[in-house]
């Protein structure tokens, strides 16, 4: 039994494919391999090519696999739903053709996963981390979004891919009440959860408590750490979530506010989680000069705790 460390392109500032400052995807794969990661996420739709031959060659060269694909889009708008379903087909069409990662005993679903995140709403983006002032969806809008998530999960399942819903700061699934409501409305045989320690903390929740609470839904996990000084400054300003990340709200694992020894303990001794965790550290892509240093530091720290 083991918990394997993997990475994500957001550690190189890759969150918005329209950002003109993104590093070449080949550089990201190379540095992820150099840092010691055995796998990485595809990143936002359109960042890595959807050409299986091109991607396979680069992955093999860097001795790295793919742990998950990502839907990071507006899950609410009806007119965007066909676009999202096309993304599901395109992403699953490539990740299912790549070499599979090992499956650990006790791991409920094999990798690769499809992480599903709601995004793209200014009224929530500017209120990330502020449960008291962030607007909530009407019952009708919430039901529509849940229907879209079920459709996404069912399409992914038709490819043999497990969809996992990722509550994300600045989206319409962020806070405690929304995560609980999601868990009630989406059966666990339809989709699992990908809880993110950093997003939980950012949005007012204790990661240990929530990892324990939803152990039976937890198929995949993201790890982050948060710089306390920057975090407090960012929450006092009226800025978007990723603007705060650009200021340095996220930091290497083990250097911030989160208690990773306690997180390791709850995962290994209490809920007996097995499988994969992905390290993330969102940043401005113009600050990629320190990405390799930071992701290696996170990887080394997690190794010291017992993660593999």
Model-assigned labels for residue ranges:
Residues 39-40, 142-252, 257, 307:
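Acidic/histidine-rich catalytic cores of soluble enzymes
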Residues 10-12, 43-45, 71-76, 119-121, ...:
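Active-site beta-loop-alpha junctions enriched in small/polar residues
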Residues 7, 32, 40, 59, ...:
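Conserved, mostly hydrophobic/aromatic
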Residues 17-32, 84-95, 203-211, 260:
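Short, acidic/polar
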Residues 2, 29-34, 49-68, 90-111, ...:
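Acidic (Asp/Glu)-rich catalytic clusters
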Residues 65, 80-193:
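Active-site acidic/histidine proton-transfer and metal-coordination neighborhood
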Residues 10-24, 76-84, 134-142:
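Active-site mouth loops of central-metabolism enzymes
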Residues 24-46:
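Catalytic domains of carbohydrate-active enzymes, especially glycoside hydrolases
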């Amino acid at each position: 039994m083991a918990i394997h460390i993997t990475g994500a392109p957001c550690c190189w500032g890759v969150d918005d494919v329209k950002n003109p400052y993104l590093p070449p995807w080949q550089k990201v794969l190379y540095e992820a391999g150099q840092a010691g990661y055995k796998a990485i996420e595809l990143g936002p739709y359109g960042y890595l090519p959807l050409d299986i031959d091109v991607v396979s060659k680069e992955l093999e060269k860097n001795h790295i696999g793919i742990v998950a694909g990502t839907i990071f889009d507006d899950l609410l708008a009806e007119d965007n739903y066909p676009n999202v379903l096309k993304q599901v087909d395109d992403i699953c069409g490539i990740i299912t053709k790549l070499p599979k990662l090992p499956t650990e005993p006790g791991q409920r679903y094999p990798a690769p996963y499809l992480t599903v995140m709601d995004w793209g709403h200014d009224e929530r983006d500017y209120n990330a981390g502020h449960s008291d002032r962030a607007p909530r969806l009407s019952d009708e809008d919430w039901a529509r979004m849940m229907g879209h998530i079920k459709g996404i999960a069912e399409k992914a399942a038709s490819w043999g891919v497990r969809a996992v819903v990722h509550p994300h700061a600045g989206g319409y699934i962020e806070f405690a009440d929304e995560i609980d409501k999601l868990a009630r409305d989406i059966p666990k045989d339809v989709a699992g959860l990908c809880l993110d320690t950093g997003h939980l903390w950012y949005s007012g929740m204790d990661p240990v408590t929530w990892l324990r609470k939803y152990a039976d839904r937890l198929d995949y996990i993201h790890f982050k750490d948060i710089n306390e000084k920057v975090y407090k400054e960012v929450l006092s300003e009226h800025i978007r979530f990723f603007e705060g990340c650009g200021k340095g709200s996220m930091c290497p694992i083990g250097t911030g506010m989160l208690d990773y020894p306690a997180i390791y303990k709850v995962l290994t001794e209490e809920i007996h989680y097995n499988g994969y965790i992905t390290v993330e550290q969102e940043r401005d892509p113009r600050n990629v000069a320190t990405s390799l240093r930071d992701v290696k530091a996170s990887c080394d720290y997690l190794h010291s705790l017992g993660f593999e």
